[in-house]
A protein has these predicted regions:
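Paired small-residue
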Residues: 82-89, 97-105, 310-315
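Structural signature of the two symmetry-related core transmembrane helices
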Residues: 74-89, 277-293
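Extracytoplasmic
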Residues: 8-42, 63, 229-234
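Conserved MFS/SLC helix-loop-helix module at the cytosolic interface between two early adjacent transmembrane helices
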Residues: 58-97
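Cytoplasmic helix-loop-helix junction between adjacent transmembrane helices
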Residues: 102-143
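Helix-loop-helix hairpin linking two adjacent transmembrane segments in secondary transporters
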Residues: 98, 135-181, 250
Length: 403
């Protein structure tokens, strides 16, 4: 336990780690309306999600290093200002090209909530306590994307898709004031600013780590599945099956329930089983769930509304339960060898997996063909990526038993 722990507001940490995911998913129920409102193609509208992750990846690469130089608190406040400007821009666009540009800026600012929050937690907690806090954060990461489509479905249905961005602009103001008043500096007093040469050497060392690449695959594939679902599912369930946006938003509750139950179970099992074993179980759940989902769509069962949707709900529950087992256990172990340069290492780690998320979500937009099959097939393929990642990670002897 660090001395910084006493000054750390868990409520604020949950809000800061959650708002980027809310920003990503809040307008997904309105994607068909965005396409028609801006006279844009489905592929270009879905690209607004991929561009979000590109901006996020670049932001993650920079904010951690900035926080090592000027402090966690200053970096967080700067990022929230950029996020607010980008969000207001999104609310006033008249073309999909403008939306792409403002979404990039919005994501660049929002990324501060991900990388700096994780760095603050690593500054403030150690060992098993850190793992438990990451379990709590994983629950927030699971629930915050669920809030997005649930809230966004109602907002879009009654106020239009632009209203989603005005809600996010208000959120940026609230978080900015809360952070200014409550967020304390957690950068260690003995922390030394890292030079450009040392950043390069750190990057080279991290890129040579097989275990770290395993964690990069785990985090990027789990998020790729989550946001690929939010990207493609509106066209499957709203356009093809005729769901109302507000009803579609309930899928967020399904995802949140599955991942939070898994995170809770992981919290209880960490004293009995290694994190690596739990990650492997999670990867198996994702692959099996995706395979069954693909099978029912391929056999045409999915087109029978009640039967198909019911089976899809069950398979999605299994998939996101598996994701809930993977994320907290991977995040808590990924950067343990780089504790003294947590901000910069977190930037490199986060930048790598967000670039992969960009690739995955772009692939989902390319796979879109007007049928339901690309979504489950995409999930199954990423299940294989998770299986590979779970085999690449290695924890030191004795450490797993304590986690």
């Amino acid at each position: 336990m660090s001395n910084n722990q006493k000054r750390l507001s868990i409520g604020l940490m949950i809000a800061l780690v959650g708002f980027p995911q809310i920003s990503e998913t809040i307008y997904t129920p309105a994607l068909p309306n965005v396409a028609s409102g801006l006279l844009a193609s489905v592929h270009s509208v879905e690209a607004t999600l991929a561009i979000y992750f590109l901006g996020f990846a670049i932001g993650v690469l920079l904010w951690g290093t900035i926080s090592d130089w000027c402090g966690r608190r200053t970096a967080m406040l700067m990022g929230l200002i950029v996020y607010g400007i980008g969000t207001v821009g999104c609310a006033n666009v008249e073309s999909v090209e403008s939306l792409l540009a403002w979404r990039f800026l919005q994501a660049f600012g929002a990324s501060v909530g991900s990388v700096i929050t994780q760095t603050i937690i690593r500054d403030s907690y150690e060992g098993a306590e850190r793992t438990k806090i990451f379990v709590v954060m994983s629950g927030a990461l699971a629930f915050s994307p669920a809030i997005g489509p649930l809230l966004g479905g109602f907002i879009s249905e009654f106020f239009g898709w632009r209203a989603n961005f005005w809600v996010l602009a208000l959120l940026s103001i609230v978080l900015g004031i809360w952070s200014f008043v409550s967020l304390s500096e957690t950068r260690p007093n003995h922390h030394k600013r890292i030079s450009a040469v040392k950043i390069y050497l750190l990057f080279r060392d991290m890129m040579r780590s097989r275990a770290l690449w395993g964690h990069i695959l785990l985090i990027s594939a789990t998020n790729g599945i989550l946001f690929g679902f939010y990207q493609e599912a509106p066209f499957v369930f709203i356009e093809q099956l005729g769901m109302q946006p507000s009803h579609y938003g309930l899928f967020g509750l399904l995802i949140a329930t599955a991942t939070m139950l898994a995170a809770r179970l992981s919290h209880q099992l960490n004293n009995r089983y290694s994190s690596q074993h739990l990650i492997q179980c999670g990867a198996m759940c994702v692959f099996l769930g995706g395979s069954i989902f693909t099978l029912i769509v391929g056999m045409g069962i999915f087109n029978v509304k009640m039967v198909g949707v019911s089976i899809a709900v069950l398979t999605l529950f299994v998939i996101f339960f598996g994701i809930g087992l993977i994320i907290p256990n991977s995040l808590s172990h990924a950067l343990k060898p780089y504790q003294m340069v947590a901000g910069t290492a977190g930037s490199i780690f986060g930048g790598c997996y967000y670039f992969l998320i960009t690739v995955f979500t772009w692939a989902m937009s390319v796979m879109h063909n007007g049928t339901a099959l690309p979504l489950p097939f995409y999930m199954t393929m990423l299940g294989l990526v998770l299986a590979c990642g779970s085999q690449m990670i290695r924890f030191p002897q004795g450490m797993a038993e304590k986690c």
